[in-house]
Amino acid sequence: MSSRIDRDVINALIAGHFADPFSVLGMHQTQAGLEVRALLPDATDVWVIEPKTGRKVGKLECLDARGFFCGVLPRRKNFFRYQLAVTWHGQQNLIDDPYRFGPLIQEMDAWLLSEGTHLRPYETLGAHADTMDGVTGTRFSVWAPNARRVSVVGQFNYWDGRRHPMRLRKESGIWELFIPGAHNGQLYKFELLDANGNLRIKADPYAFEAQMRPETASMICGLPEKVTPSEERQKANQFDAPISIYEVHLGSWRRHTDNNFWLSYRELADQLVPYAKWMGFTHLELLPVNEHPFDGSWGYQPTGLYAPTRRFGTRDDFRYFINAAHAAGLNVILDWVPGHFPSDEFSLAEFDGTHLYEHSDPREGYHQDWNTLIYNYGRREVSNYLVGNALYWMERFGIDALRVDAVASMIYRDYSRKEGEWIPNEFGGRENLEAIEFLRNTNRIIGEQVPGAVSMAEESTDFSGVTRPPETGGLGFWYKWNLGWMHDTLDYMKLDPVYRQYHHDKLTFGMLYNHTENFVLPLSHDEVVHGKKSILDRMPGDAWQKFANLRAYYGWMWAFPGKKLLFMGNEFAQGREWNHDASLDWHLLEGGDNWHHGVQRLVRDLNHTYRHHKALHELDFDAYGFEWLVVDDNERSVLIFVRRDKAGNEIIVASNFTPVPRHDYRFGINQPGRWREILNTDSMHYHGSNTGNGGVVHSDEIESHGRQHSLNLTLPPLATIWLMREGE
């Protein structure tokens, strides 16, 4: 028996107050000989076993009734592989001792993690099934530099924090432990004795799967295989590609009619994916699928940044959904939330008893609008956690793009704060320099590591250079939501047509700044909640005029420079606001053909026509791709412009935003010849009045608007028409 183990050490170890369990537990060379020590609460008998022969090598004596065993092995001088035969409640179990294994994290990984430059921290941190020295199990690691003790607790140890205290790697602040026998599918958490001596039970920040609310445990789950991007998917994200995005909240797109329960990922693959393809969309954008405790956050307050929510199935089910989308020719955009996180006790908040992931000062670390906490981007390990997450979704799931939420709240220290409620940066300014550098670095790494993948910014201010390269002072995003265009055009459309002539600039102003960024035109979920009404219900007039206005607006939007985004339900003109707790109003499409069918057909035709004609998408971000033909006819609320492709082919777009048909409307054109009406939002096919131009019109050699040739058209009421030149 050893006399070297101090009673205070044993007490501290059993009480969970000892920070260095490997200095005590496991096999050690002592003056008395080779000694094995184990902490096995509730055990009554422990033997050391030779694995090759199964022979008992020595018995461990119980030095403390609470489960501390120790024994010197006779005739043994050198370290060897061993197992422990442990009797619990009259039943003997053969186990491998976690404390016989050496350090897990390689020195280079530890250094990169400390420097914040480990591109894929999720490959090292978290829970990973592994085989060590011929023993299968799971290696656990967690960053908690200020904790006094960290243990793994889970289904494999009765959630008892005494049984598996971890090793601290002081150079990195990471705790690690290999637990033999722990396997995929088992639940676990980390139990921390924090910097202040308080006990905390935390979910794994790097968990690849987690329980669905209200439960909060992490789940051991293997790292998914990498997904190789196809050339077609890469091309579909390019600036000259047609991009029409269908934005979806998976929990409310459609539900089971019998119990209002969600569709699963696999059911969504069978229903949502073919629908989006049939409608002609090119991309699916998913509101956040990261695990989150509060349904009403729509996923924008995530606690499991690396775990797809279990609401709709398993991690593999989600991969099945993504694969189905790709097989249907749809790219997938994931809404990503690196701006803030909820303050739930089980998550990142005060993780090790200190403000580890968030700022300590609430003027920097607390978001009063959402009652959430703000990441400390200046801490290298925190930024690394987030950058790694971006790569994780792109490389391991095949996500084609990330849409970054609430960028303005990240890059401005005074965002939604009054004077005295924020702290200036080191130069006295309002910019969050650390957040700006984080975004630049993230976009730079995406570009370097995932060819063809892109990022999109929801940025609501006039911050300059959101879509410019970091090396030129930009943030490095590929695309930016054009919230200014959205607000201006919706403000215009909600006006009674008689007043629109006084607000003509609402539709023209967007072109003054259109080429400053690479824009997406968004009619997103944010525009159909919180009392804003549905898009349809914002339109003025009686039912006929509401639908006509909406169709004219969509025709304008799909032709205007910029990529397109439409939130689910808007494609068939849902009349009520979005409710995340219920299905879309699919019953509006039941029964006989109606106005809702007309809008749905229009959106489908808009998508297919938009994709077919390069002039409508190839030069979205080049001034050559757009030209006004009629910009100043505010009295009649008429606007006409040309979209152009690289080869010079033109499509004419004419909108009449009054209910008065404009007959014999002459305007100058660039290219004389025969022009065909390829889309008319007033067509009877869409339940319009069917006013139009009979399909084909010929230009006249009559000067108009400073051009030698012109067209004489009928502009339908509250409508947009598209014309394509067919020949001389």
Swiss-Prot record:
Its EC number is 2.4.1.18. The keyword Transferase applies. It is an enzyme of class 2 (transferase). SUPFAM superfamilies: (Trans)glycosidases, E set domains, Glycosyl hydrolase domain. This is 1,4-alpha-glucan branching enzyme GlgB. Keywords: Carbohydrate metabolism, Glycogen biosynthesis, Glycogen metabolism, Glycosyltransferase, Transferase. Pathway: Glycan biosynthesis; glycogen biosynthesis. It comes from the Bacteria. Belongs to the glycosyl hydrolase 13 family. GlgB subfamily. CDD domains: AmyAc_Glg_BE, E_set_GBE_prok_N. The active site is at D405, E458. Gene3D superfamilies: Glycosidases, Golgi alpha-mannosidase II, Immunoglobulins. GO terms for biological process: glycogen biosynthetic process. One of its GO terms (molecular function) is cation binding. InterPro entries: A-amylase/branching_C, Branching_enzy, GlgB, GlgB_N, GlgB_N_E_set_prok, Glyco_hydro_13_cat_dom, Glyco_hydro_13_N, Glyco_hydro_b. Monomer.
